Amino acid sequence: MDFDLGADVDALRNELRALVDQHVPDDFLGAFTHDPADLATAQAFCRTLAADGRLCPAWPTEYGGRDASAWEQTAVREEMWAAHEPRGAQYMGVNWVGPTIMRHGTPEQRAQHLPPIAHGEVIWCQGFSEPDAGSDLASLQTRATRDGQEWVITGQKIWTSYATMAQWCFLLARTSREERRQQGLTVFLVPMSDPAIEVRPIASMLGPHHLNEVFFDELRVGDDAVLGPVGGGWQVVQEVLAFERVGIARYARCERLLQWAPVALGDAWERLPEALRTRWTRMLVHCRRARLLAYRVVAQQDAGAVRPGDAAAYRIAVTTLDQESADLLVEIATDTPPGDEGERFRRAVGDHWTYSRAATVSSGAIEIQRVLLARALLADRTTA
C-alpha cells in the first residue's frame, strides 16, 4: 500500500522530526498532561511551528498559514501524534475549532479567532457532553435564552478536556424547543475568563485535572458569539466531529511504537514467540488500514463534503487499533532488556496503554460510531 504524498510532504515531515528532536524532551508526557513543565514545552513548541506557518500550513496566509495542501496538514497531524502530540492541548484548535470557524464563521470571527490559533497563542475546550447527554448529544439541556440583544446561557457540561487552561470554549446549547431534538441547537464561542463560568476538575487515570465539569450560571454573550445560524448547531457539530475524529491521528502513534519495539528489544526480539511477532505484523497492517480510512476522509474534506459513515469507519478502526496495539505492546515490553532505551520504551508503552482505555468512549463512543456506519451503509443501499 503506497502512502507517498509527494516531495513537499516528505520535506515537511523531515523538518517536523528535526524540530521534535531539537525542542521536545524525551520525558514529555504528551497532550494529556497538566504538568506545568509539559504545558510550557507545548506552548513553546507551537510558537516554533507557527513561526514558519507549520502549525497550520493548509490555512490561508492571512490567518497564519501558508496556503499549503490538505496533505501537508495531514502530515503535521501524523508527525505530531507519532511524537506523542507535542502541540499539547492546542491540537484541538488546530484540528477542528479553526477549520470549523473558517467554514461557518463571520469575517469578524475568522479575524478574531484564527490568527491566535495559527500562532499557537490560544487553547480551546469543547462544551458538548452533559451528565445526561453524552452519546445521545441531541438530548442536551444547557440552554441559551434570548434577553434583548444578548443570549443568557445556563447549564452544565462534563468530561471537558483542558477547561482549566482554555481561554475559549466551543459550546453547544439549546436555543429553542423543537419537535426533533437535533433542531433548536446553536453553537457559541464563549470566553472562559467570564466570572459566570465555573470549572471543577475531575480526577481520572489520564491525570488530575485533564477532565472537568463546567457550569454556566447566566453567562451573557452577544450575537457575535454565535457560530453559524441560530438553530443550525447540529449541522455545524456534524462537521466538527468529522474534523475531530480524523484529526486524532492515533494510528501514527501506534505505528511509531510498534516500529520501535524491535529496536528497544534488540537481540531479545528474535527470541519472542513466533505467534507474538505475527500479531505484531498484523497490527502494523491495521495501522495502514486506519491510515487509509483517514485519508479517505481527508480527501472528502478537501473536496468540501464528508460522508458521516466514512468518518465513523475511521473512528472505529483507529480506536480498536489503539486498544489492541496497546495490549500487544504491553506483552512485548515485558521482554525489554534493562537500559535507557528499554526504560523509555516501557514508559511510552505504559502511557499508550493508559490513554487507550478511554479511546472507544472519548470523541463519540464506538457503539454510536457503529450505528452511524450502519445507517450510512443502509442509506447507500436504498439509494443504489
Positions of PLM-derived features:
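Internal helix-loop-helix
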Residues: 50-111, 115, 119-120, 162-168, ...
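Glycine-rich phosphate/cofactor-binding loops in nucleotide/flavin-utilizing enzymes
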Residues: 2, 71, 75-76, 96, ...
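C-terminal helix-coil-helix/basic helical segment that borders enzyme active sites and/or dimer interfaces
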Residues: 28-36, 266, 270, 274-277, ...
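A short core secondary-structure module
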Residues: 154-200
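Glycine-rich beta->alpha junctions and the first turn(s) of the following alpha-helix
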Residues: 5-7, 197-290, 359, 375
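A short, Trp-centered hydrophobic/proline-enriched beta-strand micro-motif
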Residues: 120-128, 172
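A structural signal for short hydrophobic beta-strand segments in well-ordered beta-sheet cores
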Residues: 142-145
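Amphipathic, small/basic residue-rich leader segments at the start of a protein or domain
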Residues: 1-89, 112, 116, 247-249, ...
